[in-house]
Amino acid sequence: PQTRCAIELGGQDAKMIFFRTNDKGDIEVADMRMNGSCAGGTGAFIDEMAKLMGVGTESGEFEQLASRGTTVHEVSGRCGVYAKTDIQPLLNEGIPTTDLALSALHAVARQTIGGLAQGIDIEPPVIFEGGTLAYNPTLVRVFREQLNLSDDQVIVPRDPQIMVARGAALSLTDMFASSQ
């Protein structure tokens, strides 16, 4: 209930929901933003970057690489095609895949923050939801760093990949209970 912003990353989409306290003291949705038709900055983007590096995502291999990265290189998060043109020369130069995986996650966070917040302050606490964040804890760390959040300003629920489904079920339960 104390959440002020929800960041949800799935395989094909990215969402940011901003909450505020209304005059009655209740939490309500102030604004909601979702990415357009491009999958840049989503799980599909991470899948493409992993494929380019010759590693898997479902096995956790990409996450393991990113967690060991130490240097962030400039990679476009806006478009997978642009990102490939950034990463391929870095691969050819011999940049470690650990750093490239970390760089791709930084690109995802930049794209989400810049593309969805668009002038709205991201106030803590921030909850992180969706499968992309569930399976990439390093991505949550990157968001935390880019947003200058302390550990107590970050909420990662148990099973973040099903938070939306859980919320819908609770909402429907309340709706049907109040109509009887």
Where do the protein language model's features map onto the residues?
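Glycine-rich phosphate-binding loop plus the immediately following alpha-helix
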Residues: T21, E28-S67, L170, D174
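Glycine-rich phosphate-binding/hydrolytic loop that grips phosphoryl groups
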Residues: I46-E48, V156-Q180
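Active-site nucleophile and cofactor-binding loops and adjacent substrate-binding regions
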Residues: I7-G11, R33-G41, S103-L105, I127, ...
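Glycine-rich phosphate-binding loops at beta-strand->alpha-helix junctions
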Residues: A117-Q146, P157-Q161
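Conserved phosphate-binding catalytic cores of ATP/NTP-utilizing and phosphoryl-transfer enzymes
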Residues: P1-G10, K15-R20, G25, I113-Q118, ...
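Conserved ATP-utilizing enzyme core subdomain
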Residues: D47, T57-L91
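Adenine-nucleotide phosphate-binding core of ATP-dependent small-molecule kinases
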Residues: A83-G114, Q161
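Short acidic, glycine/serine/threonine-rich loops at helix termini
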Residues: K15-N22, D31-M32, I46, E74-G77, ...
